[in-house]
Amino acid sequence: MADDQGCIEEQGVEDSANEDSVDAKPDRSSFVPSLFSKKKKNVTMRSIKTTRDRVPTYQYNMNFEKLGKCIIINNKNFDKVTGMGVRNGTDKDAEALFKCFRSLGFDVIVYNDCSCAKMQDLLKKASEEDHTNAACFACILLSHGEENVIYGKDGVTPIKDLTAHFRGDRCKTLLEKPKLFFIQACRGTELDDGIQADSGPINDTDANPRYKIPVEADFLFAYSTVPGYYSWRSPGRGSWFVQALCSILEEHGKDLEIMQILTRVNDRVARHFESQSDDPHFHEKKQIPCVVSMLTKELYFSQ
């Protein structure tokens, strides 16, 4: 059971600002590994501008009164019965995400330490709001997790139960609009050792075409890690995934398409972060985010 910390925490043991940890249920009680994320020197080079024609037919319409709502659920503290430790560093993630998504134009609201029922209620109510004048919707979940589930402060809830409120048959005012979910949580307990590297056309035959939209269409899920693996977090700096996501969005959030943005996030997490620990089991581990897209068009946050 994990999320984004670089160490498995012992109950009652506090993280130092330099430790990375994985949000997992403690199962190695004999140690708390000392970890830090090692970032390669960040050489910011303005990438050579590649001009690519945008084809409106294949882009989401962003010409709305507002960009949309962004809900951030930031779970840091957990009931003792869950066996989960405090997610030190998650407040840095929440703060960075709030600033980043607000600068993109989202109306951002942060909720802290939510129970499973509270998370369900928040998202159900959000799905029942009128999004007619909004271009899209975003939700960011910061918590402990396992594959397919995420922790509220009092236990686990299926991620699908949270996102299903926004299906096309349940949230009509977001039909054919992008629904974005960013999930910073572990998806298992496997560790990535890494490996050394050498360095269609629209059918417009009908004047007023009628068509059905799959209820699961227009969703995007950006996970901090692949299925089965830990996700790392630094109590001093925040999670690797969120650090990279905010950095790329600040640089290119208004000029790159969402999949280009998330591909760069993948690259940054994969190349710029690595754990170090006195315990060989947690030494020099890597992480790669995972994107699952059911988007049907290209998404640019600027018109």
From Swiss-Prot:
Biological process (GO), any one: cellular response to staurosporine
- Provide the effect of T173A: Abolished phosphorylation by PAK2
Pro-sequence residue ranges: 2-23, 199-206
Pfam families in UniProt: Peptidase_C14
Please describe, based on the UniProt annotation, the reported consequence of changing Y229W: Strongly reduced thiol protease catalytic efficiency
Q: Region (Loop L3): which ranges? A: 226-238
Q: What is its EC number?
A: 3.4.22.60
* Sequence segments annotated as region (Loop L1): 76-87
Residues at the catalytic site: H144, C186
Tell me what PTMs the record reports for this protein: Cleavage by different proteases, such as granzyme B (GZMB), caspase-1 (CASP1), caspase-8 (CASP8), caspase-9 (CASP9) or caspase-10 (CASP10) generate the two active subunits. Its involvement in different programmed cell death processes is probably specified by the protease that activates CASP7. Cleaved and activated by initiator caspases (CASP8, CASP9 and/or CASP10), leading to execution phase of apoptosis. Cleavage and maturation by GZMB regulates granzyme-mediated programmed cell death. Cleaved and activated by CASP1 in response to bacterial infection.
> Is this entry keyworded DNA-binding?
no
Subcellular location per UniProt equals:
Cytoplasm, Cytosol; Nucleus; Secreted, Extracellular space
The observed outcome of changing D192A is: Strongly reduced thiol protease activity
Q: Where is this region: Disordered?
A: 1-30
Q: What is the effect of changing D198A?
A: Strongly reduced cleavage and activation by initiator caspases. Abolished cleavage and activation by initiator caspases. In P7-D2A mutant; abolished cleavage and activation, leading to decreased but mesureable activity
On this chain, the residues bearing N-acetylalanine are: A2
| (Microbial infection) ADP-riboxanated arginine found at | R233
A GO CC annotation recorded here is:
cytoplasm
Q: What is the effect of changing S239A?
A: Abolished phosphorylation by PAK2
Record-level Gene Ontology MF annotations: aspartic-type endopeptidase activity; cysteine-type endopeptidase activity; cysteine-type peptidase activity; peptidase activity; RNA binding
Q: Where does the protein principally reside?
A: cytoplasm
Q: PANTHER family attached here?
A: CASPASE, CASPASE-7
Q: What does this protein do?
A: Thiol protease involved in different programmed cell death processes, such as apoptosis, pyroptosis or granzyme-mediated programmed cell death, by proteolytically cleaving target proteins. Has a marked preference for Asp-Glu-Val-Asp (DEVD) consensus sequences, with some plasticity for alternate non-canonical sequences. Its involvement in the different programmed cell death processes is probably determined by upstream proteases that activate CASP7.
Quaternary context? Heterotetramer that consists of two anti-parallel arranged heterodimers, each one formed by a 20 kDa (p20) and a 11 kDa (p11) subunit. Interacts with XIAP (via its second BIR domain); inhibiting CASP7 activity. Interacts with BIRC6/bruce. Interacts with ATXN3 (short isoform 1). Interacts with HSPA5.
What information about domains appears in the record's comments?
The exosite polybasic region mediates non-specific RNA-binding, acting as a bridge for RNA-binding target proteins, such as PARP1. The exosite is also required for interaction with non-RNA-binding proteins, such as Hsp90 co-chaperone PTGES3.
Its protein name is Caspase-7
Q: Which organism is it from?
A: Homo sapiens
